[in-house]
Amino acid sequence: MNVIKSRRPAVSPEIDPSTLSNYQNFAVSNTELFLDVLFDEKIVAGTVLYHLEVLNKDVSEVILDTSFLTVESVTVNGSEAEFSLHERVEPLGSRLAISIPPNSQKVQLFISFRTTERCTAIQFLDKEATDGKKAPYLFCQCQAIHARSLFPCFDTPALKSTYKLSAKSPLFTLMSGRPVNQEGDMYYFDQPVPIPSYLISIASGDIVKAKIGPRSDIYSEPVKIKDCQWEFENDMEDFIQIAEKLVFEYEWLRFDSLVLPSSFPYGGMEIPNLCQLTPTLICKDRSQVTVMAHELAHSWSGNLVTNCSWEHFWLNEGWTVYIERRIIEGIATAEAIKAGKKDPFAYGESMRHFSAIIGWNDLENSIKAMGNDAERFSPLVLDLKAGEDPDDSFSTVPYEKGFNLLFLIEQTVGGKKVFDKFIPSYFKKFRYGSLDTYQFVDYLYEFFNDKKVELDSIDWESWLYKPGMPPVMPKFDTTLADECYELADEWFSAIKNNSYLKHDFSSADIKSFEPNQSVVFLDTLISYNKHKDFNWKDHVDALKLMETAYTEYDTSLNAEILFRWYMLQVSGEREEFQHKLGQWLGTVGRMKFVRPGYVLLNEVNRELAIYYFKKFESNYHPICKTMVKKDLGLV
């Protein structure tokens, strides 16, 4: 604990270095946001009304974040007010400074604004770029610091507000709140639970809905709606009920979701009342519904209890992965009971561990792919005080390193039954608030005041502040992974002994695999490139034999499997698969696949990587486009 104390900031929660605003001086009792979607101009115009409480009587101005915004007018308490838009500071944007009367206690701040073509939060799609090809489409992604390019705001997770939301659009529109009313082309929403700016969202297009649970609908373009409904209707309500038993009652009333067009850059985004999902989850085998479990878990970790800055992002994502895997465990246990398995609870636990094994592999690959940036961006608690773009630090580290720390804490305090008492207490303690790592650790020690010796055994210095992999690897139950390891080892041994052509490899090897077992099998094969004196490019014949034996991989609808299959074959520098990967990267926008896909292509054939990126660049969301340009050294 002395290490934590030595690093503790003067103020806790820590001041957010990724905002230019003076948010510490204000509380926001409510925000009224109106957005006018102008498809022809590909911009959004709007107004925002802040109901502010002044916390510092000496403050003379409100400073908000903006980025590439046009500010048209400002009023304070109904009167026109002086304002200045400061020079841009990359990558954080421009301060919008607005004078307020001296000794103000409450302020009503009204701003009229328009986005510009350089807005990084929104993407307009022409109708040809949509699945249905009937109407244009708009969607939004504000995390981490892109809300400031949509509307002037305190763009920090440290400050929350309730919202009255409205939008004008010629097409069906959804926002990050509960639908209240529609009058012609006007749409109204209410968000009574306080949320930070990064959870604001809007989507508008040819959108319909279908029921997937008693308190859940799924939205998508009409051509996809039946597939989307089938993918999620089996599990949605069970997910919610398992999470409620673990934490406490779901607070947001409804859990509705929207499957976005393919250019959406993330697997999912935990927008309250409008969970946004990548279409790569629609693989017709329900194997990727765990992403929905992840986004649902954010309803408590991230949305109710929030990291105070992106330096402490692991508090959002590590907790969310932990809850997600407890949901997976609960679903697997229920299925095992229904199937009459001998020890259903052990089976459920083995499924949780199996998911954690996949996550550990992802963490290793992510840190390796960072290269020199691993020193800065692989500690659990980040340092962004030099004004870095939080997007540059985005990786699986806060997710998987964060999960593994919580998993270690669970084991250290006495297992799930003991740790489960802490979970609802923690989320009630910090509900509606934002916190840093120091507050989390303080409350952990306060709650388990009889387990100080056990908690002190955790190497907090290494876990929180040192780059690279965690200091210890948990002892995972490998029951479900062993089959995958054994088959991969058969291939490795046959190749090393030059006997693979005589080996009877066939599709029967993987016939009984669950989809995620194929993921682990392929991950293991890819990992053999780390072995000394082994490189897949020296064993192309083996890769060709694999292609013949496992034809289902080449035609898989599961993006997690297809991506790894392509990565394995491209690591052998097979030219036909370089083109297959390049073409596939033009059909997905999810950065989990797009970024490492281009990085690998760049390693084996830079000319081809740049060719395919230039070919598909206009399809990608601005966030994705910027990150790939950095990955390829094009900026």
Swiss-Prot record:
Signal peptide: none
Sample GO molecular function, one term: aminopeptidase activity
Keyword Metal-binding: yes
Keyword field: Cytoplasm, Hydrolase, Metal-binding, Metalloprotease, Nucleus, Protease, Zinc
Active-site residue numbers: 295 (proton acceptor), 399 (proton donor)
InterPro entries recorded: Aminopeptidase_N-like_N, Aminopeptidase_N-like_N_sf, ARM-type_fold, LTA4H, LTA4H_cat, M1_LTA-4_hydro/amino_C_sf, M1_LTA4H, Peptidase_M1
Pfam family, one: Peptidase_M1_N
Chain sites annotated for binding substrate: 141-143, 265-270
Enzyme Commission number(s) from the entry: 3.4.11.-, 3.3.2.10
Keyword Cytoplasm: yes
Gene3D superfamilies attached to this UniProt entry: 3.30.2010.30, Neutral Protease Domain 2, Peptidase M1, leukotriene A4 hydrolase/aminopeptidase C-terminal domain, tricorn interacting facor f3 domain
Coiled coil: none
Family recorded in the similarity comment: Belongs to the peptidase M1 family.
Biological function: Aminopeptidase that preferentially cleaves di- and tripeptides. Also has low epoxide hydrolase activity (in vitro). Can hydrolyze the epoxide leukotriene LTA(4) but it forms preferentially 5,6-dihydroxy-7,9,11,14-eicosatetraenoic acid rather than the cytokine leukotriene B(4) as the product compared to the homologous mammalian enzyme (in vitro).
Entry protein name: Leucine aminopeptidase 2-2
Native species: Scheffersomyces stipitis (strain ATCC 58785 / CBS 6054 / NBRC 10063 / NRRL Y-11545) (Yeast)
